[in-house]
Amino acid sequence: EIHPFNAVTVDTVRSFDPKGIIFSGGPASVTEATTPRAPVELFKMNLPIFGICYGEQTMVAQLGGEVTLSDHREFGRAHVDVIGDCVIFEGVWKTGERHQVWMSHGDRIDQLPDGFRAIASTESAPYAAIANDDKQFYAVQFHPEVVHTPDGAKIISNFTHTVCGCGGDWTM
């Protein structure tokens, strides 16, 4: 199910008993006080969460990390260096490899929240992908949902199937 950020409450989420949550991207800057935020209670529901672009930034900011407005906006094709193994990369990417992705962001993550580690980086985005394996929180600065990230669908599938345990009886 898809729900807009401003119409979601924890009770709404509980009512459909999800196996995981995906925070999507968006054009806003997390550095502005009036931009979208996830309900804080979602982070306490013991559900896997996957953040995409703005979804990564808001996750980091809300969990105690640091996000700033970047001097270098990334837009278009980029190459990420895989710097850590992770369940969302299983069967897709390995540590030491470089892969094409699609970036579109103006914010920069400068410090991760406690418990997180970097799993991929670019020259200007040291936290292009992050993981907190204990909480099953994962996030990427790039856009796995677009065709310009060739392995993106596999990364999303690893989150939905492997991490969340969803069956394959639904479509994207």
Sequence positions of predicted segments:
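Flexible gly/pro-rich beta->alpha loop and the following alpha-helix that scaffold active-site loops
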Residues: 1-52, 57, 63, 154-172
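Pocket-forming structural segment of enzyme catalytic cores
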Residues: 23, 33-52, 57-153
